[in-house]
Amino acid sequence: ALFDIIRGSIMNLYKRDYIKSVPTKQEMQLYEGILCTERKAVGDRGFGKINHRRLYPAAVRHYDSLFPNNHIELFDFQNEGNMEQLNEEFCALIHDANTNERNVLRFINHRPAYHIIAGVFKYYNFGHHDAYVFPEFALGKYIADYLLIGKSSGGYEFVFVELEHPNGRTTLKSGHEGETFRKGTYQIYDWKAEIEAHFSASFVTITKYSNKSSLPKEFSEYDSSRFHYAVVAGLREDYNEATYRDRRNKVTQQNILTLHYDNLYDKACELETAQSF
């Protein structure tokens, strides 16, 4: 499989190290042949631009990105041909009463099924131009379960994701947030404080996952409007009108998106036929 985590190197999504292993001569020849075909098609038509990116060798696409070993493209997941199977396995997992958040993390990271967590991009307006997934990203003394980095025409933005128990005390009888959601929210408060106080130190480690001599300014100049947070806990059945009201308030007041695991499943299913994240 193209998507496979390297044991002991959680930050690398792939078997191949796309930083150390540069595109081969054969891969570059294939790439240049496709570029030639694109130019010829434009010449015959006389206008516009032809892009056959889906045909470019993966090594070329990843190596050319900001973070080669964390770069994702939706059509790669789709070409694997097992998205539907993975989605149904995920659905069964989250609805198993014995499943906890570590089981979910293990499934996404080691099955692997990164498109499931990348589905969080569908709640935002970035990620369709460029997208990255970093599992277990260190923020000082804290660890975010996932950091998603996505690009739109406005540049790069960041989503820190915390996974909590799918079958824990998610909500109270009233529908308001229970212990599980509060735990995730408190964790995000700590992340926010760490990023705001030590942005440069928090983000300096990300440079070692890049093969570029410099990164866009979004990675060195803190802009709170580019930072987003998400907590995933519980299932659809745990939510009622009060829960959804709390959810709306938390997004508008604290920039924290609260999701249940069925939301992840729904978005993962949408990605089976989507054009972009």
Residue ranges of each PLM-predicted region?
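Charged, terminal alpha-helix-loop-beta segments
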Residues: 1-277
